[in-house]
């Protein structure tokens, strides 16, 4: 079975004509629907791309806002820590100053108490000495002294003791 050139050309023309008729029929009856489907799909893809871009921009804005909030929180936490350190330092300094003042006050009170005790002891010694002096003087003189003479004698005796 051999095919001649004429048959080949005839088949070619027949197939080409059939394809052209088929394309014309598709264009007349189905092309509008196919074009509509392709247009709808193109619009859907375009909307999806736009939504993806909007979502990306929204995510970037949200990320920037979150980062700004995080930075503000870090700054606020740092300020709180700094303020707490400063307050702690001030309170520590205040406590040290109060303790120093209290120590000075206690030292001054102790010195005052020592001076008072010393004065009381000297006064007690003077009184004791005056009594002894009076007794000694009475024995030596053989007579009782009145208060004025007693005071003068005591003062004189104490002055002599103070110089010694």
Swiss-Prot record:
Name the UniProt key words of this record, in alphabetical order.
ATP synthesis, Cell membrane, CF(0), Hydrogen ion transport, Ion transport, Membrane, Transmembrane, Transmembrane helix, Transport
Coiled-coil ranges (or none): none
- Subcellular location(s) per record: Cell membrane
Key word Transmembrane present = yes
Q: Does the keyword Nucleus apply?
A: no
- Extract the InterPro entries matched here: ATP_synth_B-like_membr_sf, ATP_synth_b/b'su_bac/chlpt, ATP_synth_F0_bsu_bac, ATP_synthase_B_chain
Q: Where is the signal peptide?
A: none
Q: How does it sit in the membrane?
A: Single-pass membrane protein
Q: Name one GO molecular function term.
A: proton-transporting ATP synthase activity, rotational mechanism
Extract the Pfam families matched here.
ATP-synt_B
Q: Where are the transmembrane segments?
A: 6-26
Q: What is its main location?
A: membrane
GO cellular component term of the entry, any: proton-transporting ATP synthase complex
UniProt lists the family membership as follows: Belongs to the ATPase B chain family.
| Entry-linked PANTHER family | ATP SYNTHASE SUBUNIT B (PTHR33445:SF1), ATP SYNTHASE SUBUNIT B', CHLOROPLASTIC (PTHR33445)
* Free-text function comment from the UniProt entry: F(1)F(0) ATP synthase produces ATP from ADP in the presence of a proton or sodium gradient. F-type ATPases consist of two structural domains, F(1) containing the extramembraneous catalytic core and F(0) containing the membrane proton channel, linked together by a central stalk and a peripheral stalk. During catalysis, ATP synthesis in the catalytic domain of F(1) is coupled via a rotary mechanism of the central stalk subunits to proton translocation. Component of the F(0) channel, it forms part of the peripheral stalk, linking F(1) to F(0).
> What is the protein's quaternary organization?
F-type ATPases have 2 components, F(1) - the catalytic core - and F(0) - the membrane proton channel. F(1) has five subunits: alpha(3), beta(3), gamma(1), delta(1), epsilon(1). F(0) has three main subunits: a(1), b(2) and c(10-14). The alpha and beta chains form an alternating ring which encloses part of the gamma chain. F(1) is attached to F(0) by a central stalk formed by the gamma and epsilon chains, while a peripheral stalk is formed by the delta and b chains.
Q: Which named protein is this?
A: ATP synthase subunit b
Species in which this protein is naturally found:
Streptococcus pyogenes serotype M1
Taxonomic lineage is: Bacteria, Bacillati, Bacillota, Bacilli, Lactobacillales
What gene name is given for the protein in this entry?
A: atpF
């Amino acid at each position: 079975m051999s095919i001649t050139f004429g048959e080949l050309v005839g088949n070619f023309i027949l197939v080409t004509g059939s394809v052209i008729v088929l394309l014309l029929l598709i264009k007349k009856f189905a092309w509008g629907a196919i074009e509509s489907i392709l247009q709808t799909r193109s619009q859907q893809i375009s909307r999806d791309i736009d939504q993806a871009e909007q979502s990306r921009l929204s995510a970037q804005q949200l990320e920037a806002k979150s980062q700004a909030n995080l930075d503000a929180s870090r700054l606020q936490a740092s300020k709180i820590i700094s303020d707490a350190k400063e307050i702690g330092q001030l309170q520590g300094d205040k406590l040290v100053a109060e303790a120093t003042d209290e120590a000075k006050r206690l030292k001054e009170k102790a010195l005052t108490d020592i001076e008072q005790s010393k004065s009381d002891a000297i006064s007690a010694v003077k009184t004791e000495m005056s009594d002894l002096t009076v007794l000694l003087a009475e024995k030596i003189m053989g007579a009782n002294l009145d208060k004025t003479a007693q005071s003068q004698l005591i003062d004189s005796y104490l002055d002599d003791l103070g110089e010694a």
